[in-house]
Regions:
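ATP-grasp fold ATP-binding core
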Residues: 106-107, 129-149, 169-180
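Short loop segments at secondary-structure junctions
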Residues: 109-110, 122, 153-156
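Short beta-strand-to-turn element immediately C-terminal to the catalytic PLP-Schiff-base lysine
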Residues: 117-119, 149-154
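Phosphate-binding site of ATP-dependent enzymes
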Residues: 153-183
Length: 183
């Protein structure tokens, strides 16, 4: 493909998630690379520009992180506008962003996944520790990167992690610790 075959490309960045700053860094790096390739690319910060402004672009390079960028929302909007974009479709993005839903899909497909327990306001450290070896993790289901992920080995850490994770998402779960290198 030639640079002109992409048309005008909106590099979507920034947004409103708790990962805004890293999204801006990623977006500007992608914008520089596209411009170096002579692609007609433009920065588009979804926090400061209305999404209807996307109609003037032929395609979008998604550099939004977390909520509204990786959860299928922006993909659904781009689909409705008929704008092609990078990454997975809306449904795959939504499933990929939801850690708990992903684990259910893995189990249904017989794909091994660390043991986990859905938590609620009645959950307590002692009961979770009986089910999962100590230490374990508490995770907000819908959050990108490692935001909303807490390693827990005490009652105090458990209470703090549960409280903080609930600020991010209503669905929070505990997951066993698996030692190894993260890829």
């Amino acid at each position: 493909m030639t640079p002109s075959s992409y048309g005008q490309v909106a590099v979507l960045m920034g947004g409103n998630s708790n990962e805004r700053e890293i999204s801006l860094q990623s977006g500007h790096a992608v914008l520089r690379a596209l411009l170096e390739l002579s692609i007609d690319a433009f920065a588009f910060d979804t926090k400061h520009e209305t999404l209807t402004g996307l109609k003037k672009y032929d395609s979008a390079f998604i550099c939004l992180h977390g909520k509204d960028g990786e959860d299928g929302k922006i993909q659904s909007i781009l689909d409705a506008m008929g704008i092609r974009y990078t990454g997975s479709n809306a449904q795959a993005s939504a499933y990929g962003m939801d850690k708990y839903k992903s684990k259910e899909i893995f189990l249904a497909a017989n794909i091994p996944t660390p043991k986990f327990l859905l938590l609620n306001e009645k959950s307590n450290f002692r009961d979770v520790s009986k089910e999962l070896d100590n230490p374990f993790f508490i995770k907000a289901s819908n959050s990108g990167s490692s935001i909303g992920v807490y390693k827990v080995s005490t009652e105090e850490q458990f209470q703090h992690a549960l409280h903080e994770a609930k600020k991010i998402d209503d669905i929070v779960f505990a997951e066993e610790n698996i030692s190894g290198r993260e890829l």
